[in-house]
Amino acid sequence: MNNRRILFLDYMRVIAFSLVVLGHKFNKDLSSLANDPSNHVTLRLFYGLLADASFGGAMGVVIFFLVSGYIITHVLQKEATFEFYLKRIFRIYPLYIFAVLAEMLIQYYNGGNIPPLSIIIPRLLLIGDFFNTPLSLAGVEWTLRIEMLFYVFMGLVKKVGLINKGNVLTVLLLFISLFISTINPFPVAKDFHNAYFTLYTPFLFIGVVVYLTEHKLVNRIVALISIVTMFYLHLSLIEKINPF
């Protein structure tokens, strides 16, 4: 991956991060500015577009997942499965565990209770979706949960030798997306985090297909059909599940 492409992906991360921050902290303010008749019509249009783009931080998350799917596919061109897993573990878990424990200590210091081990252990291992474990870190933990499942899956893809078999891998990702769309939404929650695995996994897969397409590892027609279908699945599911 050349420096120009790395720089572009860094820009995408900055845009994604900015949209997430705007969505969680300033979306109501942007909506108010967009509906304020005292503002110039051009500014109102700009604020409105920004409010829509950052609503719930969803667009930022989509960009993050697209970039992640792309980068992980690139990384696995060179790294073996064991090496890949080891690097992901040491890149994510130490800082994440520190942040979760720090959050618990702060909550305890402010009069809160330390959760039981039945919550702490799945939370620290990022497997809480399988145990109905409440999210930590103000809810942002969910993105790491889905990322870890994606890493496990992609490591297996590498292990069985499909990482460079673009057509087979793309069709596999498409069928997995179709299968996910037919089963019960996962995980079940009462707020924005409802069914995030069901809704956002296709974007990780789209990132994979984009990489395969760029490096001419997949037929472009197969790639286009798969990307359009996976995006359509997201739109149809988000309307059906309606996490907002």
Predicted regions located by residue number:
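Membrane-interface helix-boundary motifs at transmembrane edges
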Residues: 5-6, 77-87, 111-113, 157-168, ...
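Specific transmembrane alpha-helix
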Residues: 17, 58-77, 143-161, 173-220, ...
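Alpha-helical transmembrane segments
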Residues: 12-21, 98, 170-177, 227-228
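Membrane-interface helix-boundary signature
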Residues: 2-12, 47, 51-57, 136, ...
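Membrane-interface helix-loop-helix regions
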Residues: 32, 36-59, 86, 91-148, ...
